[in-house]
Amino acid sequence: MELSRRNRSLLSVVLNLLALSFSVAAFFTSYWCEGTHKVVKPPCLSAVKSKNCQALALNSSSTGSDATDTNGTLNPNVVHYNWETGDDKYAFKYFHTGFWFSCEKHQGEEACRSFIELSPDSEKGVLWLSVISEFLYIILLSLGFLLMCLEFFSSSNFIDGLKINAFAAIITVLSGLLGMVAHMMYMTVFQVTVNLGPKDWRPQTWYYGWSFGLAWLSFTLCMSASVLTLNTYTKTILEFKYRRRIFEKNVRECNPFLDPEMVRFLWEKYIFSVSSTVEDPFNWHKGFGSPIFVDIGSITDLPGAVKEEERGMDLEDDGDQC
């Protein structure tokens, strides 16, 4: 089932709106990557083996009072031992991270740190470049959406709408390319941070989160909208060229002595007169045998034009009538 030009424009607007919504949601959320951190438990934190926890002084002659201070807390100058082995001595903290924050959840509490500060100094420039690219991606996507809406709801003629359609397609393609580059740069920075970031942050395991999925879904919808818009423009231009060849052929068959400038003027007059009254001039007369009526009785201002009474040309593709 072939969609009409107006339906294709509406579909492009919807796809662009979805892409814009998903890109904003992904950029300002911190669920691009999720996983767990493996950290050593504080001394005597284990409820199961707390009875085996001992604090021994550095000096073998130290008494039990040396292991604790006056407040009853463990003395930081004392070596602390616990008898937990394997994974019993580690705590696994869930974390999620995005462009702006990396948050850890442990025992019902969540603590967040700036991901920009966590990234290595060598990667901060790339990270800021990815942030700027994401901003440009959203801005260009918004501009493309506004142009598509203008082309869809505008009451201007068909030719002006076609120009807006072409510009919207170019803007949307550029935004999609910027978004793809931004996503890839961020993931590169994240993987470097996993290996070279702070030791207390490096994840034990990690996987892609729903923000990452939204970002690439936004890119897919963006490129789909741009391809659909560009397809509408290209299809219309090819139809223009084909119909113009048929038009010029029929005009020359009916009047072989007509000046080429006159033929070009007749074509432009026909296109603009039709596009100002109908949405799609090519749906106005389907088929090769449809007549094309052009009034040239008022043409007197072109060089070499012959001033005559009002007359018309009824041209058909088979060349039998003129």
Swiss-Prot record:
<protein>
    <recommendedName>
        <fullName>Germ cell-specific gene 1-like protein</fullName>
    </recommendedName>
</protein>
<feature type="topological domain" description="Cytoplasmic">
    <location>
        <begin position="147"/>
        <end position="166"/>
    </location>
</feature>
<feature type="topological domain" description="Cytoplasmic">
    <location>
        <begin position="1"/>
        <end position="8"/>
    </location>
</feature>
<keyword id="KW-0472">Membrane</keyword>
<dbReference type="InterPro" id="IPR050579">
    <property type="entry name" value="PMP-22/EMP/MP20-like"/>
</dbReference>
<dbReference type="GO" id="GO:0045202">
    <property type="term" value="C:synapse"/>
</dbReference>
<comment type="similarity">
    <text>Belongs to the GSG1 family.</text>
</comment>
<feature type="transmembrane region" description="Helical">
    <location>
        <begin position="167"/>
        <end position="187"/>
    </location>
</feature>
<comment type="function">
    <text>As a component of the AMPAR complex, modifies AMPA receptor (AMPAR) gating.</text>
</comment>
<feature type="topological domain" description="Cytoplasmic">
    <location>
        <begin position="231"/>
        <end position="322"/>
    </location>
</feature>
<keyword id="KW-0770">Synapse</keyword>
<dbReference type="InterPro" id="IPR012478">
    <property type="entry name" value="GSG-1"/>
</dbReference>
<feature type="topological domain" description="Extracellular">
    <location>
        <begin position="188"/>
        <end position="209"/>
    </location>
</feature>
<feature type="topological domain" description="Extracellular">
    <location>
        <begin position="30"/>
        <end position="125"/>
    </location>
</feature>
<dbReference type="GO" id="GO:0005886">
    <property type="term" value="C:plasma membrane"/>
</dbReference>
<keyword id="KW-1003">Cell membrane</keyword>
<feature type="transmembrane region" description="Helical">
    <location>
        <begin position="126"/>
        <end position="146"/>
    </location>
</feature>
<feature type="transmembrane region" description="Helical">
    <location>
        <begin position="9"/>
        <end position="29"/>
    </location>
</feature>
<dbReference type="Pfam" id="PF07803">
    <property type="entry name" value="GSG-1"/>
</dbReference>
<keyword id="KW-1133">Transmembrane helix</keyword>
<comment type="subunit">
    <text>Component of the AMPAR complex.</text>
</comment>
<feature type="transmembrane region" description="Helical">
    <location>
        <begin position="210"/>
        <end position="230"/>
    </location>
</feature>
<keyword id="KW-0812">Transmembrane</keyword>
